[in-house]
Design a protein with these regions (language model features):
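Structural motif
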Residues: 226-228, 269-270, 313-320, 360-365, ...
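Bacterial Sec-dependent N-terminal signal peptides
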Residues: 1-20
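Conserved beta-propeller blade repeats
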Residues: 246-262, 288-303, 335-353, 381-401, ...
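Multi-bladed beta-propeller domains
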Residues: 228-248, 273-289, 322-337, 367-385, ...
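Mid-chain, structured segments of secreted extracytoplasmic proteins
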Residues: 76-90, 96-97, 262-298
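Beta-strand C-termini and the immediately following turn/loop, strongest in propeller blades
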Residues: 217-223, 243, 256, 261-267, ...
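Extracellular glycan-recognition regions
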Residues: 19-218
Length: 507
């Protein structure tokens, strides 16, 4: 009898372990509501994607049946991912998406961002345990269809749903107050076949769970915020997290060999393989107060850095140049503040933004890496701002962001500062245009419209976008929580197919 009891306990333990096996970033993985056909969730570390298979009659009325990959989480958070059904499917109302749930009980309160097989996209909820969900009282419908990216955000008791067609900004689907949802909840991915006799499958990628901080957040007072170092193919939008830390690092450059990235952290510069692994410090001699404005010359031999100094010539950020293999940097700009942003293709000159003569306005300057008399390329008025200046690979243009029109937009001008031409015309605050090595594309970051026009703060809901170098309609290539330090400097891969950037995972 003891042997039978022990065997039963082992079998039960194995079943529970199978349901809660860690799957990628998720600790929970289970069928909810005991569907007749068991589901599964798998994670592919090669591309950091998920595959969910599941059955179930529905997620509706007073009880649910579906497959769920989830974490226990509390407080405010943002859930974002790309979704695609596999195969034609049996029922047009097969569904996948994000779900926030009070418990694993089949009749638990929940609120879900749902994408159906026929394209119907809705936010649905059950307010109370065992409550019967009703149409249309317990759902909000998206106006469009064909969405691929789904986001669900909780801020206090309010839950917001957003959705986007690939390449387009998020649309606000709606919000709902879950007054009876506990602070500690389950949050994760789900799939339901809407037919208890079949199994459906979904592919899910770019899965991110972020913990946003408040607008009054202060890092020195409130502690470190997590960072991810990511790479992304700009043409299919697929992202890879290669390094994570509960602390701040910023602004990756892609090394000329295509095999490593360079980024700043705690005043120093570090290298890491593009596939992840151990970080190694790059020697910058006595210059050890480096910020997020650094980049590599076109010939791959030199590195420009911006670092704080305090001497008779100036106090604040100055531009230096050092060999890419490391060494003691050479000062380029004795006057401060000066922030590097671009190399000339001749590898002998740099451009940077700086304030001069005590006037609180940044302008774009050019100078030889040997120092000497700098040349002002812009002369803007107080209240305006310019930043993010880079040469095109042929040296013909300088691209930059500027608030000449009253909103921060992308511009280009001739290399001598003449012929200013506006490139973006939308409501977003567009910063840091980075030109691909082949000269064909601009990758840049877009802040929300409500951000102050000359500001690029940290910890915001931002987009990375791509557009032709000659102008045209921008395409969204990434939705993330980030901002300052995400992509301040050139980060293209040598083959012009990928970029690197930093996103914030939150506290």
């Amino acid at each position: 009898m003891k042997t039978i009891s022990l065997l039963f306990c082992l079998l039960l333990s194995g079943t529970l372990m199978a349901q809660t096996t860690v799957t990628g970033i998720f600790q929970g993985n289970a069928d909810i509501g005991n569907p007749a056909i068991k589901g599964s969730a798998s994670y592919n570390p090669a591309d950091q994607s998920y595959s969910l298979k599941g059955s179930g009659y529905n997620i509706w009325f007073e009880r649910d049946e579906f497959r769920y990959a989830f974490n226990q989480i509390e407080g405010d958070f943002i859930l974002t991912a790309n979704f695609r059904f596999e195969g034609q499917g049996t029922d047009p109302h097969r569904k996948t998406g994000w779900m926030i749930r009070a418990s694993e009980d089949e009749d638990s309160p929940h609120i879900s961002a749902v994408m159906h097989g026929d394209g119907l996209t809705v936010m649905q909820w059950r307010d109370f345990k065992g409550a019967e969900m009703k149409d249309p009282e317990d759902e909000l419908f998206a106006k469009g269809s064909g969405y691929e990216i789904i986001q669900l955000e909780r801020a206090g008791k309010i839950v917001f749903m957003r959705a986007a067609v690939a390449g387009k900004p998020f649309e606000n689907i709606g919000s709902y107050a879950m007054e009876n949802m506990p602070d500690k909840v389950l949050a994760g991915l789900f799939i339901c076949s809407h037919n208890p006799e079949v199994t459906e499958q979904a592919a899910i990628w770019n899965v991110r769970i972020d913990k946003p901080v408040g607008d009054n957040y202060n890092a020195s007072r409130d502690g470190a915020v997590g960072c991810r170092l990511e790479t992304m193919n700009v043409f299919d939008g697929k992202r890879m997290v290669i390094h994570e830390k509960q602390g701040r690092f910023e602004a990756p450059n892609w090394m000329p060999d295509g095999k490593q990235l360079l980024f700043n952290m705690d005043g120093l510069l570090y290298k890491i393989p593009v596939t992840g692994g151990s970080v190694t410090q790059l020697n910058t001699g006595t210059v050890i107060r480096n910020n997020n404005d650094h980049g590599i010359s076109f010939n791959g031999k030199l590195l420009a850095i911006s670092s704080s100094k305090d001497d008779a010539a100036g106090r604040g950020s100055a531009v230096y140049v050092v060999k890419l293999k490391g060494g003691e940097p050479r000062l380029v700009t004795p006057e401060t503040p000066s922030y590097w942003h671009g190399w000339h293709p001749n590898n002998k000159e740099v451009i940077y933004v700086a304030q001069r003569k005590g006037i609180p306005v940044y302008n774009i300057y050019r100078n030889s890496i040997k120092g000497g008399k700098e040349v002002a390329l812009t002369d803007i008025s107080e209240g305006e701002h310019v930043d993010g200046c880079e040469y095109s690979p042929d040296g013909k243009y300088i691209y930059y962001n500027g608030s000449h029109t009253g909103n921060m937009q992308l511009w280009r001008m001739n290399a001598d500062g003449t012929g200013r031409e506006q490139l973006t015309f939308d409501e977003y605050k567009n910063w840091f245009p980075h030109i691909s090595p082949d000269g064909k594309w601009i990758a840049f970051i877009s802040f929300p419209p409500d951000i102050e026009k000359n500001s690029h703060p940290s910890y915001k809901r931002v987009m990375l976008r791509l557009m032709p170098a000659g102008g045209g309609e921008p395409k969204v290539i990434a939705y993330l929580y980030g901002g300052q330090g995400t992509i301040n400097v050139p980060s293209w891969s040598p083959d012009s197919k990928q970029i690197a950037f930093v996103s914030n995972s939150g506290k």
